[in-house]
């Protein structure tokens, strides 16, 4: 069973409330297979993996926000390209 020192993760994020929010967002990504884990899974649950990633400094709130912005931009670009193609065909 993995041992995660939450105090080390709190020090990386700043406070325990931000830690909870960041870990929950990352765990949800892992659970839905939106992204691959950045640390070995070792048969751990997504919440433990998320905390280990935060503890190692691989994930933080800024990184999560940047990923979401990039995904939104890619989605918007794809939609605009589709609309453009529809207008070109008419």
From Swiss-Prot:
Name of encoding gene: rpoZ
InterPro entries: DNA-dir_RNA_pol_omega, Pol_omega/Rpo6/RPB6, RPB6/omega-like_sf
Function noted in UniProt: Promotes RNA polymerase assembly. Latches the N- and C-terminal regions of the beta' subunit thereby facilitating its interaction with the beta and alpha subunits.
Organism in which the protein naturally occurs: Histophilus somni (strain 2336)
SMART domains from the UniProt entry: RNA_pol_Rpb6
Principal EC category: transferase
Protein name from the UniProt record: DNA-directed RNA polymerase subunit omega
One cellular component (GO) term of this entry: DNA-directed RNA polymerase complex
Similarity field: Belongs to the RNA polymerase subunit omega family.
Keywords for this protein: DNA-directed RNA polymerase, Nucleotidyltransferase, Transcription, Transferase
GO molecular function, one term: DNA-directed RNA polymerase activity
Record bears the keyword Transferase: yes
